[in-house]
C-alpha cells in the first residue's frame, strides 16, 4: 500500500479536492484522478517528466507512481502546516517544494525541509510509513545514500508511522545506531541502513509533541 491508497479515506474530502484546496497545480489533480489523457493533453511537459521516472516506479504504472508522489506531498504539506501552527519555524527546502513532478534528472536528494530557531537552522528529512512496517518489524530502513547524506548534513529525521499514528526523531548530528544491509528486497536489492526501534522509540503522534521534540534538538 502506497501513500495514495493509505490516504484515500484520511481526509474528509477526496485527495484531488484536498490538492485543489492546497492550491496545487492542475497536473496534480489529473494525476490523482488517474486521468492520463487529461495530463498528457493539457500538461504535456509534466507528463513527459513523469515518464522519465519509470525506473523509480517499481511495479506501479507511471500514473500510480505519480498518485503516490502527489498524495505524499499532500500529507507532508498538511504536516508542515500543523507544525507551524504548533510554533515550529519550518519551511520546505527540497527540489520538489513547488509540488510539480520533475524529470528524474532534475530531482535532487536534498532534505525536505529546513527548521529554524533563532540564528540556528537544521535540515530535516520527513519519511512516512503508510503500511505499519516499522511497528510490525520494530525497525526502519533508510537507503544508504540518504542515510549518509543526513549524516553529512547533520540533519534531523522525522519518521511518521501513518498507519499506527506514531512518530520518531533521529538526530544525525549524533552518532546513529544502524546496521548496514547490502541488499534489501523492499528497495529492489539496493543497500540500506536499518534502525532498530529499541534504540529509536516510536511515540504517540501529536503535533505539539513533535514540535517540542524538534526544538529541543536544534
What are these regions (language model features)?
Residues 149-177:
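Nucleic-acid nuclease catalytic cores
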Residues 64-68, 99-104, 132-141:
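Short, flexible/disordered intra-domain loops and linkers
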Residues 91-92, 123-125, 157-161:
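A structural signal for short, well-ordered beta-strand segments and their strand-loop junctions
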Residues 93-120:
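Active-site metal-binding core of divalent-cation-utilizing nuclease and nuclease-like domains
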Residues 129-153:
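Mg2+/Mn2+-dependent nuclease catalytic core
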Residues 172-218:
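Intrinsically disordered, low-complexity terminal regions enriched in charged/polar residues
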Residues 1-87:
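Interdomain/boundary linker segments immediately adjacent to catalytic/signaling cores
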Residues 79, 111-132:
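Conserved catalytic cores of phosphodiester-cleaving nucleases, focusing on short active-site segments
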Amino acid at each position: 500500500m502506497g501513500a495514495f491508497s493509505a490516504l484515500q479515506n484520511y481526509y474528509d474530502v477526496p485527495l484531488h479536492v484536498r490538492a485543489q484546496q492546497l492550491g496545487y497545480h492542475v497536473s496534480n489533480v489529473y494525476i490523482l484522478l488517474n486521468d492520463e489523457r487529461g495530463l498528457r493533453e493539457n500538461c504535456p511537459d509534466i507528463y513527459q517528466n513523469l515518464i522519465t521516472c519509470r525506473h523509480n516506479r517499481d511495479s506501479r504504472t507511471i500514473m500510480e507512481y505519480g498518485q503516490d508522489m502527489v498524495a505524499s506531498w499532500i500529507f507532508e504539506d498538511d504536516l508542515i502546516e500543523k507544525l507551524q501552527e504548533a510554533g515550529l519555524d519550518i519551511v520546505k527546502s527540497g527540489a520538489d517544494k513547488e509540488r510539480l513532478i520533475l524529470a528524474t534528472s532534475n530531482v535532487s536528494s536534498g532534505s525536505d525541509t529546513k527548521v529554524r530557531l533563532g540564528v540556528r537552522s537544521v535540515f530535516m528529512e520527513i519519511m512516512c510509513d503508510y503500511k505499519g512496517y516499522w511497528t510490525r518489524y520494530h525497525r526502519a530502513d533508510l537507503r544508504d545514500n540518504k542515510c549518509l547524506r543526513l549524516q553529512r548534513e547533520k540533519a534531523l529525521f522525522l519518521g511518521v508511522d501513518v498507519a499506527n499514528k506514531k512518530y520518531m526523531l533521529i538526530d544525525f548530528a549524533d552518532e546513529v545506531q544502524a546496521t548496514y544491509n547490502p541488499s534489501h528486497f523492499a528497495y529492489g536489492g539496493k543497500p540500506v541502513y536499518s534502525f532498530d526501534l529499541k534504540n529509536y522509540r516510536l511515540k504517540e503522534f501529536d503535533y505539539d509533541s513533535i514540535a517540542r521534540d524538534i526544538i529541543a534538538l536544534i
